[in-house]
Amino acid sequence: MMDEELDFLLGTMQWSFSRLNSYYNCAYEWFLHYVECNKSENGFFGEYGSLIHKILEKYEKGELSLFELNEYYEDHFDEDVPHDAPPNKFVNIRQSYYDKGIDYLDNIDLDLEKYEILGVEKKVEFKINDKDFVGYI
């Protein structure tokens, strides 16, 4: 890819936290994914986050009670999070996340009657130094 093409691509790209974080973690992987447009499969962290989001959404919609969250988590963890976490010589990240998920859902204090939900994953678009950004809140 020529420098001019890369400058054009970067100048017209819509940026997000995940794009910036991807670059921060591995510039080459970011290049392959966002510049070369190589498909990458979802990894452990994305799958884990999607499972937690799905559980909380089911609770908000009334499909799961507060007392059913952990059971759903345990029943769906291996199916919804099939990829292994990256290796770490100090801790088994997969097991650590699994345990923290159980602890989180066991101790969650989420009384929806106390809150007015204004939106879920509401898209927000803005500019920083003439660069387009998108985020979800």
Segments (PLM) and residue ranges:
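Nuclease catalytic cores
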Residues: 17-64, 98, 121-122
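Nucleic-acid nuclease catalytic cores
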Residues: 125-137
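A non-catalytic, helix-rich entry segment at domain boundaries
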Residues: 51-128
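Short hydrophobic-acidic sequence motifs that mark active-site Asp/Glu residues
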Residues: 31, 117-119, 136
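Accessory/regulatory regions of helicases
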Residues: 1-6
